[in-house]
């Protein structure tokens, strides 16, 4: 079998285990046959990418490669191995230790590094880890063509040779400098919109997800006007365990009963939100004070807002679509662009979110899932703004020919769907290098200053419903100020809160909290995950994909509607069907493999009027996915089946659901993903029982065997 690409949406992630505990002889075979990342894999992966940059003449010997991580590697084995890979390749490893992803990528830009490695599995469970890569200068993440080259390089390397290779690159620790830079960056009023006075009287519960923000967040949030309670700041308790954004995805409000007795029992942040809200209930009912929450993910690049509603005694969850809408409204109030500003979101977003921002004056664009595609748009439009500035200043025919060549190459890259971040970055840099060599750095710096002005940069907002909201920021390096676009959970939180405080009514009312929950006429939105899958079964041309496509088309035969199958340039593997009414989008239904977790999902988006149709469709398609796409060789899938069998005849306690043959898997994770994510089982007190969906899956599975 030809292996083209081992990465997912955002780098590579998976369950981690020390090499000595695996049966494979080398890190690649362990990954391919056991689906496990070892510390040796981390060394091989960073070495391979540094070699890629050196051979592409993007880096030279002893150039810098920044590396940092979230706190999940408690032993340090994986972190140290990744550092060794950098040094064996001949680059200088600039270690910044535990910092949020935005701080690491920012420091890479600050020191002019060739790349940055972030060792994290983001919102994934604590038993997993991974590697994100940012390319120097552009700060782009790797695209599919980059991933393919890196995959082939990893497959061709002999780890035994690498094991004995010398450490020829240097090592330095810049943690203090990188930490200081990020604190100063976030304190700069240019980089968030929040006025400290607007926090007066607020209580803010901050959930660091036991992740990368844990050792830093109290120094970042030092506004004296607000009262802070910091939760989940102890990595020893497990990153993302009953904390962070992942379990809040798709949730718009959480009742008091769910927090005290139900699905969210034991979630410290939610418990404190409820307790603090009830303590101040009378005060909250009669003025504009709020009990708020900031919830980050493990590596700190995204955020959800929480707000206690005293009228309903519940906690509202403000996701990415809603935060982006609030931020867009505030931007529109504060700026007049030279062109219509651009709002970018992904296919996961509510269809009505795009329509809502169009109505307030934005041009909209939809891209594939993953903030790397949003970063691409921000980088491309930033480059275009600089190019227009240069063209107004430079008459030389040589420059005009060069810029036309670069533009043509980038257009061809997009049209061919061969997205290549290193190729794009080198092209961006070629123009800047020409200006620097032939005219001088002063013009380059003035172009940076020009595009740092929001009205000159038409990229306004990039948004994912998962809580990535990306807007323009500015980084000062010496006498140069340059634009920066980074997924930054804290910046997102502060900007969203600033927008809400400006746009809101003066006094708390039931209508205010309803507006906070739903500021635009929302559509129908449902995402149904299937865990422990064989992702190859969704490949183009596979029998199951064809069967799934036919099943979708048969069940989307709605009156007076047309259906079109759409192939996204950025993610051709996704099966996407648009439903049109009078030629206009009415619904979108798609199935895609997750690029960050061991799962696939069915996504349904559409107008509220189509809710019954879409729910009926889900009832037919979701069981098919649950039954057909599980990876029969996955220990998690096998354990899941055993749990269903154990519960077939009645409720059981946790002790009755453990299996000696699956001692290495996390039972807590398994039960969590079977219950809160797939709805196959449910918990009542200290017992577990099978749901109707679980029983259907079990019955059909037994029949097929």
Give, region by region, the residue ranges found by the protein language model.
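Short amphipathic alpha-helical interaction segments
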Residues: 661-676
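Gly/Ser/Thr-enriched, mixed-charge loops and adjacent short helices
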Residues: 4, 15, 127-287
